[in-house]
């Protein structure tokens, strides 16, 4: 293939000059001849010069170094050999367990499935987490976002979902760690290993310390592996149901922002890249379910300064089937998971999908909590005594519901000392229905805090008296 030479280096962005009749195409991978570094072409500037992003550190590079064009986009290993392995953005193993034993590779840039290949999701995916199953149920083959500011529990929620779904679900999972803490990636690996499901998980990491090129493309690497599992036919001619976990989708946007100005683009609102919606759409449209197989995706979304109107989380909202919003106010009450029951939504919360009983109980819970929210100002100024008897009852039930929405997690056992609880959906509905009906008005609200099913609250009440 053609060879060129480096003519300019600005951080992660590198300009390479090629002969005019042998210019690489956009998204072609280039390799340095004398160093182990891959570049990805982003723009053709003319006069034989292309602008590229480095998929690694550009330290030690200098002008005039030789670069070879591979003539194809970055491709990564796919298939069963990737399971149980930790790989980087280029699909190279980083777990010191030898090379990935496969010749099957797939380019990280793929077209999204065509409209007529898509399948509509209607089945509910039970998570065992009460607040999620009741108020923002997940769809099999759907897309879910966990929104939250710094330190409200996105990663812990993500880990619990992996614990409850990936272990119960006999299918395959892909975990893409995008710009997050290396420690969390290590914890995740050991968590999977200890629970004997490592052979069903492929892990791709581009952590916080990596250059922006790695963080920009690592989500696509993980997605490409998940797509292969989805499209790979078994003996019955069907694809697989795959789980794709992305932590954190905001860092994907942030990496794009870091290189956008270096690529010569004018920044848009709040300094984000002008191509924000298009970049997000290109990634999200590929995370979808076809008639052959499905990808159920759970994505953590960091919310800068707790502002949900920030362009990055706001752009992500449009692509999701369910949004789980984690609230700092609820976390400050000591209620975990700190899911905001009035802000979190799901397209599946429809009587035609979840059934009348589930829908009625969920809306009853939300209306009780909403009424409590409205009464809080009155209580703060005038006190409880000024409320009508009916409103006092609403407040008492709302406080019980609020506490019953908390739940001990398996992944937090080592910190809290209380064993994790998995609550089946029918138990969740039964519990909240009973609280709304007033069957537990005689129990103290503390009995409902950090328990699993409603029977545990009744047992706990006996120990409180």
Swiss-Prot record:
Its EC number is 7.1.2.2. It comes from the Bacteria. One of its GO terms (molecular function) is proton-transporting ATP synthase activity, rotational mechanism. It is found in: Cell inner membrane. SMART domains: AAA (SM00382). Keywords: ATP synthesis, ATP-binding, Cell inner membrane, Cell membrane, CF(1), Hydrogen ion transport, Ion transport, Membrane, Nucleotide-binding, Translocase, Transport. It catalyses: ATP + H2O + 4 H(+)(in) = ADP + phosphate + 5 H(+)(out). Its main location: membrane. It is a peripheral membrane protein. ATP binds at residues 148-155. GO terms for cellular component: plasma membrane; proton-transporting ATP synthase complex. InterPro entries: AAA+_ATPase, ATP-synt_VA_C, ATP_synth_F1_bsu, ATPase_a/bsu_AS, ATPase_alpha/beta_chains, ATPase_F1/V1/A1_a/bsu_N, ATPase_F1/V1/A1_a/bsu_N_sf, ATPase_F1/V1/A1_a/bsu_nucl-bd. Belongs to the ATPase alpha/beta chains family. F-type ATPases have 2 components, CF(1) - the catalytic core - and CF(0) - the membrane proton channel. CF(1) has five subunits: alpha(3), beta(3), gamma(1), delta(1), epsilon(1). CF(0) has three main subunits: a(1), b(2) and c(9-12). The alpha and beta chains form an alternating ring which encloses part of the gamma chain. CF(1) is attached to CF(0) by a central stalk formed by the gamma and epsilon chains, while a peripheral stalk is formed by the delta and b chains. Produces ATP from ADP in the presence of a proton gradient across the membrane. The catalytic sites are hosted primarily by the beta subunits. This is ATP synthase subunit beta. It comes from Chromobacterium violaceum (strain ATCC 12472 / DSM 30191 / JCM 1249 / CCUG 213 / NBRC 12614 / NCIMB 9131 / NCTC 9757 / MK). The lineage of its organism: Bacteria, Pseudomonadati, Pseudomonadota, Betaproteobacteria, Neisseriales.
């Amino acid at each position: 293939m053609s060879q060129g030479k480096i003519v300019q280096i600005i951080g992660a962005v590198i300009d390479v000059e090629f002969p005019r009749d042998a210019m690489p195409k956009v998204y072609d991978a280039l390799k340095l001849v004398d160093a182990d570094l891959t570049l990805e072409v982003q723009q053709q500037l003319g006069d034989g010069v292309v602008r590229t992003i480095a998929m690694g550190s550009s330290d030690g590079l200098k002008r005039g170094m030789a670069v070879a064009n591979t003539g194809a986009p970055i491709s990564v290993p796919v298939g069963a050999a990737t399971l149980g392995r930790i790989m980087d953005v280029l699909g190279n193993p980083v777990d010191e367990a030898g090379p990935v034993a496969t010749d099957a590779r797939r380019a990280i840039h793929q077209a999204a499935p065509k409209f007529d290949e898509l399948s509509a999701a209607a089945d509910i995916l039970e998570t065992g987490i009460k607040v999620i199953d009741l108020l923002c149920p997940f769809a099999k083959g759907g897309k879910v976002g966990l929104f939250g500011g710094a330190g409200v529990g996105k990663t812990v929620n993500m880990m619990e979902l992996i614990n409850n779904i990936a272990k119960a679900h006999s299918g395959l999972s892909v975990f893409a760690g995008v710009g997050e803490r290396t420690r969390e990636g290590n914890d995740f690996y050991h968590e999977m290993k200890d629970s004997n499901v490592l052979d069903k998980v492929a892990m791709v990491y581009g952590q916080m310390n990596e250059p922006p090129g790695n963080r920009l493309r690592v989500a696509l690497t993980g997605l490409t592996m998940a797509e292969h599992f989805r499209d790979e036919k078994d003996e019955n001619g069907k694809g697989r149901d795959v789980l794709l976990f992305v932590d954190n989708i905001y860092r994907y946007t942030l990496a794009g922002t870091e290189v956008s100005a270096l690529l010569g683009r004018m920044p848009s609102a709040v300094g984000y890249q002008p191509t924000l919606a298009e970049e997000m759409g290109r990634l999200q449209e590929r995370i979808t379910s076809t008639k052959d197989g499905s990808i159920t995706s759970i994505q953590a979304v960091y919310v800068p300064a707790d502002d949900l109107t920030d362009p990055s989380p706001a752009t992500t909202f449009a692509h999701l089937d369910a949004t789980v919003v984690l609230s700092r106010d609820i976390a400050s009450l000591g209620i975990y998971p700190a899911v905001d029951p009035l802000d979190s939504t799901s397209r599946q919360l429809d009587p035609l999908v979840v059934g009348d009983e589930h829908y009625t109980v969920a809306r009853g819970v939300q209306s009780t909590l909403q009424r409590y929210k409205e009464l809080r100002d009155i209580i703060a100024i005038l006190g409880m005594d000024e409320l009508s008897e009916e409103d006092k009852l609403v407040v008492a039930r709302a406080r019980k519901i609020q506490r019953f929405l908390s739940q001990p997690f398996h992944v937090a056992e080592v910190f809290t000392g209380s064993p994790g609880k998995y609550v089946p959906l029918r138990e969740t509905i039964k519990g909240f229905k009973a609280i709304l009906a007033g069957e537990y008005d005689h129990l103290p609200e503390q009995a409902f805090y950090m328990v699993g099913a409603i029977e545990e609250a009744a047992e706990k009440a006996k120990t409180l008296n």
